[in-house]
């Protein structure tokens, strides 16, 4: 389960009453260290408020309040994406090398086939594909546009 993290800001010279909270931000207690939040910036996640440094992954300790980070909350644990997938994601096998693909690894997917990034290359010339490159999927083999005729001829398909 993924949770959104809200970034809040307040001007230290004036302490407005939060429209949702109906209490001044300086009276907020951090969900991590249990201290008052007097910082200009703070976070809201899992129905609690946090200092930026206190909202971290329970396993690896990485900061979860950084831009672009997602917070996963399961079984009472705050987790980064990598640790969430490591604990709860499903591993699979690469269609090219038949070796294990860990749930947190970056992959390429074509139809129902999944490949390690380093395995996603032309079976004939071994060239790695770039965005926009054209290829053909033949069984589990990926063949670049330039090698399709030769590949099918060698493998008795024409």
From Swiss-Prot:
Superkingdom assignment: Eukaryota
* Every LIM zinc-binding domain range: 30-89, 94-153
Secretion signal, residue range per the UniProt entry: none
GO CC annotation, single: nucleoplasm
What keyword terms does UniProt attach to this protein? Chromosomal rearrangement, LIM domain, Metal-binding, Nucleus, Proto-oncogene, Repeat, Zinc
* Main localization of the protein described in the UniProt heading: nucleus
- InterPro entries in the record, alphabetically? LMO_RBTN_TF, Znf_LIM
Q: Name one GO molecular function term.
A: transcription coregulator binding
Gene3D superfamilies reported in the protein's UniProt record:
Cysteine Rich Protein
Subcellular locations according to the entry: Nucleus
Looking up Pfam families in the UniProt record yields:
LIM
Q: Which GO terms describe its biological process?
A: positive regulation of transcription by RNA polymerase II
Subunit: Interacts via its LIM domains with ELF2 and LDB1. Also interacts with basic helix-loop-helix protein TAL1/SCL and can assemble in a complex with LMO2 and TAL1/SCL. Interacts with BEX2 and KDM5A.
Q: What does this protein do?
A: Acts with TAL1/SCL to regulate red blood cell development. Also acts with LDB1 to maintain erythroid precursors in an immature state.
Q: What does the record's free text say on domains? A: The second LIM zinc-binding domain interacts with KDM5A.
Annotated disorder: A chromosomal aberration involving LMO2 may be a cause of a form of T-cell acute lymphoblastic leukemia (T-ALL). Translocation t(11,14)(p13;q11) with TCRD.
> Under which name does UniProt file this protein?
Rhombotin-2
Q: Gene name, please?
A: LMO2
